[in-house]
C-alpha cells in the first residue's frame, strides 16, 4: 500500500535527520530521500548552517533520475534565499512528481508557502504523516518560530528529597557518571548554555562539551550566556580560556575590564538586585539562538519558574537522602498553599 511505503520512507528520512542534531543549530534537523520505482536513488541530511540542505544533497545524488520521482522530507522545503538557494526551485527544476512532508515549516519565511508553490507547479503534495515525530525532533526550532523566543530546558541533579548540595554547598557528586555523560550530550545538542556568576565562580566551571563522542560532532562549542550583574567573574576563570567560543555576559554595571573579542557585554536592566530575565531572553532570541540549556543554582531556576519561562525540566534524581538542612533545587518562597501550586505534566 502507498500509505505503508510513505511511512517507511518518511521514517528513514527522520532517522537521517537525527544525524545532524549535534551540528545543525540553529537550523532544523532535516532528512530527505528520493524514491523512484520503489528504489532509493538519493538521500541526504542537513549537516550544519550554511551547508547544503537535505533536499539538495538527495536530489544531487539522484541526478537526472529525479524526474517523476517522489521526495520524502520531514520538514517543508524552503522557498527563500538564505545562505543556500531555495530547495523549492531545485525540486521543480528536477521534475519531482510528488513530495511527502511530515510538517509545515513554522518559519514565517516559509510556513506553507512552499507547499502552495509546489501544488501550483503541478506537484502532488502529501502533508502530515509522522507529524508528531517530526515536531518532536525539531521542538526547539518549532518553539522559537511559533513563540518568538528560545526553548528553555532547565537541568537539575538532585537527591530523592530534592536537594542539590549539602548545607556547605558540597555537591560532588550527587548524581552518577551516567548522568554527567548525559549532560554532555544535552550540552552538545543545545544552541546555548545559561548559568550565573555564582555557579561559575564556585567550581570554576567551563560548562562546555568535553566528551570526545559529542565533541567530534560539533562545529563549535555552544555559546555561553552568563548572568553576572556586578561582573564578579575573574578574567583568569576557565570559561575565558577558549577564545573561539562566543560568550554573552549580562550585567547591570559599566566596567573597565578588558575582555577578549569573543566576549560580548550586554547592559541589562535590573530590579531588586535581579537582572531582567525577559529582557535577556528577548536579546538571546535576537541573536538567532533558538534554545537554552540552563545549568544553575536554585535562585536563577526559581526566577525562571516564577516568570513562566521554563519549557521543560530535566531532572537527574539520585537514590540518596540529604536531609532538611541541605540546599533545595529551588528557592521559591511565595507558594505556601496547595492552591498556589505551579502545575506541570510529565
Stretches with model-predicted labels:
Residues 2-11, 16-20, 25-27, 43, ...:
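Enzymes that bind and transform nitrogen-containing heteroaromatic metabolites
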Residues 22-24, 115, 130-157:
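Proteins enriched for Cys/Gly/acidic motifs involved in redox and nucleic-acid/cofactor modification
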Residues 29-38, 156-157:
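Short beta-strand scaffold segments in enzyme catalytic cores
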Residues 32, 110-111, 137-138, 206, ...:
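Short Asp/Glu-rich motifs
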Residues 34-133, 305:
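Zn2+-dependent cytidine deaminase-like catalytic core
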Residues 53, 82, 109-110, 136, ...:
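Residues that form or flank phosphate/diphosphate-binding pockets in enzymes
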Residues 114-116, 140-143, 209-211, 329:
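Short low-complexity, flexible loop/linker segments enriched in glycine and/or proline
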Amino acid at each position: 500500500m502507498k500509505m505503508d511505503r510513505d511511512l517507511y520512507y518518511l521514517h528513514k528520512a527522520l532517522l537521517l535527520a537525527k544525524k545532524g542534531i549535534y551540528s545543525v543549530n540553529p537550523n532544523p534537523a532535516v532528512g530527505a530521500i528520493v524514491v523512484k520505482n520503489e528504489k532509493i536513488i538519493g538521500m541526504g541530511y542537513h549537516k550544519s548552517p550554511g551547508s547544503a540542505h537535505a533536499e539538495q544533497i538527495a536530489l544531487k545524488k539522484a541526478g537526472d533520475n529525479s524526474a517523476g520521482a517522489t521526495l520524502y522530507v520531514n520538514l517543508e522545503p524552503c522557498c527563500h534565499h538564505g545562505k543556500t538557494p531555495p530547495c523549492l526551485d531545485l525540486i521543480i527544476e528536477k521534475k519531482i512528481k510528488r513530495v511527502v512532508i511530515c510538517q509545515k515549516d513554522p518559519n514565517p519565511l516559509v510556513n506553507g508557502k512552499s507547499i502552495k508553490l509546489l501544488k501550483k507547479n503541478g506537484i502532488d503534495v502529501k502533508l502530515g504523516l509522522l507529524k508528531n515525530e517530526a515536531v518532536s525532533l525539531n521542538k526547539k526550532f518549532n518553539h522559537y518560530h511559533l513563540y518568538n523566543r528560545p526553548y528553555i530546558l532547565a537541568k537539575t541533579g538532585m537527591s530523592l528529597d530534592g536537594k542539590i548540595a549539602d548545607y556547605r554547598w558540597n555537591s560532588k557528586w550527587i548524581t552518577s557518571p551516567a548522568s554527567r555523560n548525559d549532560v554532555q550530550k544535552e550540552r552538545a545538542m543545545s544552541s546555548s548554555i545559561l548559568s550565573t556568576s555564582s555557579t561559575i565562580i564556585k567550581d570554576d566551571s567551563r560548562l562546555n562539551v568535553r566528551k570526545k563522542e559529542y565533541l567530534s560532532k560539533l562545529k563549535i562549542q555552544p555559546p555561553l550566556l552568563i548572568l553576572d550583574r556586578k561582573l564578579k567573574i575573574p578574567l583568569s576563570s576557565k570559561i575565558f580560556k577558549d577564545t573561539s567560543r562566543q560568550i554573552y555576559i549580562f550585567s547591570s554595571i559599566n566596567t573597565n575590564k578588558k575582555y577578549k573579542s569573543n566576549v560580548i557585554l550586554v547592559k541589562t536592566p535590573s530590579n531588586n538586585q535581579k537582572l531582567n530575565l525577559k529582557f535577556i531572553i528577548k536579546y538571546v532570541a535576537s541573536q538567532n539562538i533558538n534554545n537554552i540549556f540552563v545549568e544553575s543554582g536554585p535562585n536563577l531556576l526559581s526566577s525562571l519558574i516564577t516568570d513562566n519561562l521554563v519549557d521543560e525540566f530535566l531532572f537527574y534524581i539520585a537514590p540518596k537522602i540529604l536531609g532538611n538542612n541541605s540546599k533545595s533545587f529551588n528557592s521559591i518562597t511565595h507558594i505556601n498553599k496547595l492552591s498556589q501550586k505551579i502545575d506541570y505534566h510529565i
